[in-house]
Amino acid sequence: MKRIVIFADEPDWHCRRLLKAFAQRQAAASIVSLRKCGFSLGGDGSGLLIPGFERSLPDVALVRNIPSGSFEQVTFRLSLLHALRELGIPVVNDARAIERCVDKSMTSFLLHRAGIPTPATFVVEDQERAASWRRTEPADVVAKPLFGAQGRGLSRIAPGEPTPDPGGDPLRGVLYLQRYVGRARDWQDYRVFCVGEVAAAAMVRRGASWVTNVARGGVCEPAPCTGRLAELAAAAAAAVGAGYCGVDLIEDAERGFLVLEVNSMPAWKGLQSVAEIDLADRIAHHVLGL
């Protein structure tokens, strides 16, 4: 029987679905917080401290979330995931994929490098350079926190409005600016859930404003997970090396679907409410096949 560690802070809805999915596939899964893990070096053994896995390491690790904390704490927790990979334990998603997705600038770079269409993006620390770039942009731009999620900290800036000062919250020293793609009303975008670099399910998110995240009141509707939408989402997952992820896309009148972001630790409760497949079971199937 395979032993799975699910790294999460608490047994939320997602974890309960995953525990059930693994049990139905005759695998033993347990939830462990990365806060409780560590290193013990200098003696015998792997050098890793994972509660419940003192005698032997798990067969596979699945990361639901990494707790927030100081820069040192988050770096340490990522180091634990790096160490598991160095020891030959499959990690979904591993620290490399998480780092690539948490940092929006690296996500955008990897999408660009892979030839995946995205909105024009400019990332610098210097406010004057950002203002100079904005003067070449004919329309609104969106300023995003480099490490933001769930629609928090976004601001839409019209031509002629001042470029924000990157100091302080929410930008914290870095200006990540992206050309606004959307409508004057009837705002919507798409979330595609990928597992094993395959597009598994999709939804349309309709918002009361241009920020359509479910956490910001967006309404979920099913969408066909086919064609160009599925193709681009799968390509984005491959570009960042994610074993499972949520890919956000928007439709441009001229360029078609564009990839906005990739989330390496996605929630899927909203998508599950309109999906025909069990997404937790799809994740379990992928993890147990590694």
PLM regions and their residue ranges:
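Phosphate-binding site of ATP-dependent enzymes
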Residues: 150-237
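Glycine-rich phosphate/pyrophosphate-binding beta-alpha loops
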Residues: 263-275
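A long amphipathic alpha-helix within ATP-dependent nucleotide-binding catalytic cores
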Residues: 210-259, 280-290
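Rossmann-like NAD(P)H-binding beta-loop-alpha module
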Residues: 114-138
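Protein kinase-like catalytic core scaffold
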Residues: 141, 200-201, 245, 258-261
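Structural motif
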Residues: 62-64, 142, 176
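Conserved N-proximal alpha/beta basic substrate-recognition cap immediately N-terminal to
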Residues: 9-120
